[in-house]
Amino acid sequence: MNKHFAKLSQWTGEKFGFDRQKTTLSDDFCSLKGETDAWLVGMDKIHRSCTRWVRNMDKRKGLLDEKDKQLPVTHVGSSFVELGQALSHSSSNSHTYIMYGKSMVEIGHLQEEFMDYLNNSFLANLENSLAEFKALDVKEKKMENRRLVFDALSTKIQKAKKEESKLEEDLRNARAKYEESLEEFEDRMVQLKELEPDRVENVVRLLQMQIRFHQKSLDLLKGLEMNGFSKKRDNVNIPKRTYSARSIPSNISSTNVATTPSNTIFEMDDTLKADSSSNEYHSPTNTLPSYHTEADLDNSSIASSNRTQHTEDNYNKDVSDAQNSLGQSAVDLTTPSSPPIPRHTKPKLSTTQSTPVKPASLQSEEDIQLSFKQPELSASSAELDEKLKSQCNVSPSPSNISDAPPSKLNRSYSSPLASISSRKVVRMKYSFEPETENELKLKKGDLLLVLKEIDEGWWVGEKLGEDGVFTGNTGMFPSNYCVPAHPWDKTFRAFLKKGFK
């Protein structure tokens, strides 16, 4: 008890600056101890950082459909190999994916070998060195305790008034134990310093293994380059789409035929325009007049329908060949972004004259019928014009339409409900680009009043403005591009409010 109290008193006096005698050590010993402490701190940091490095490199994760866990680089290689094998029958470049995938898998095996060396050799030697330094710390604490006992007894003897043989004997024993532990501690520090070449050799072997790992990885990647991996690859041999129209007249240039991936459009507008001097219309057969009656609608569209159907058949055949050549990975080229235009029932209602159009609320059923009729193909253009003029003698003048706003025209009749109550209002679900002068250019969301249903594929209607009034823009549009207008639609409600007041 007295010995522990004396040791505590000695330690307190040294810490708080009391007059206590303390045994001093040599400069060589202090220098060696400082170097040993630096080694202990450094080796501990190296061990913790290398452990974290190996743990990150050795992370193995499995995909959702795989039970075995692999390195990320091995997963990458396996994915490339699977892609190449899947495209082996449909792509000439499948071997490229397989070559790169196998190289990545081999790099994964090299990484596993490198990590095995880190775990079994480098980190093992590092842990042994760290254990030796930590064992030295135990010897240091033992030496420090004996020093405190020795210094406490020395201070006690100096303060004693008379000599005591027992105190002197305890002092000699404490001195011997302190010198013994001091010698052991110093010898162990010297031994650890002599083992420094072994620690350096461990780092050199780590460097050599790193060079070996990266050199083999580089050789694998360069081997791909030497085998022509980096050369420019040819495009996949996809059969090109070619289109040919049946019986195209000589007066129509090839630039008037435009082919697109989703449809084929024959641009006939320039050839159907009237000649300014002779006032005659040129058509593929030189017999089609400028106006067409509804009775001969099917006869007039036979030639255009045949050409369009023939072109679409060629296009569908080419798309089918392309899909067969690409296998399962071919892109579905026949899927349009909007519904297909019903070309097989599309009437050819082309006209080159700007004719004033009544608002839908002022048009009678007779006007709508006459505006979309077609004469016989055997009749001459002049005779057909005279016939249509006699039938359409009730057409208003342009000034009567442009001077008065549509809202006032609606109110000039006592009961507009009788003319529009039997018709329906639709909203465009897709945008529509016209191909002839008789078709309306419409955007998604436009509201139209249906004037006439020509057939199941094409309707005639008048576009409504945002405030619900008639715009005077009348023409054809595909019926599968629109849906019935909702009763709570803002424009529809404005139209009903203006139309039924």
UniProtKB/Swiss-Prot annotation:
The SH3 domain, residue ranges: 421-487
Gene Ontology MF term list: lipid binding; membrane bending activity
Alphabetical list of InterPro entries matching this protein: AH/BAR_dom_sf, BAR_dom, Endophilin_SH3RF, SH3-like_dom_sf, SH3_domain
Regions of compositional bias (Basic and acidic residues) in chain numbering: 309-320
Gene Ontology process terms (BP): endocytosis
Superkingdom assignment: Eukaryota
Modified residues (Phosphothreonine): 285
Protein name per UniProt: Uncharacterized protein C19C2.10
Annotated compartments: Cytoplasm
Keywords: Cytoplasm, Phosphoprotein, SH3 domain
Upper classification of the organism: Eukaryota, Fungi, Dikarya, Ascomycota, Taphrinomycotina
Domain BAR: 14-237
GO cellular component: cell division site; cytoplasm; cytosol
Region listing for Disordered, in residue ranges: 302-321, 329-414
Biological source species: Schizosaccharomyces pombe (strain 972 / ATCC 24843) (Fission yeast)
Modified residues (Phosphoserine): 414
Compositional bias segments (type: Polar residues): 390-402
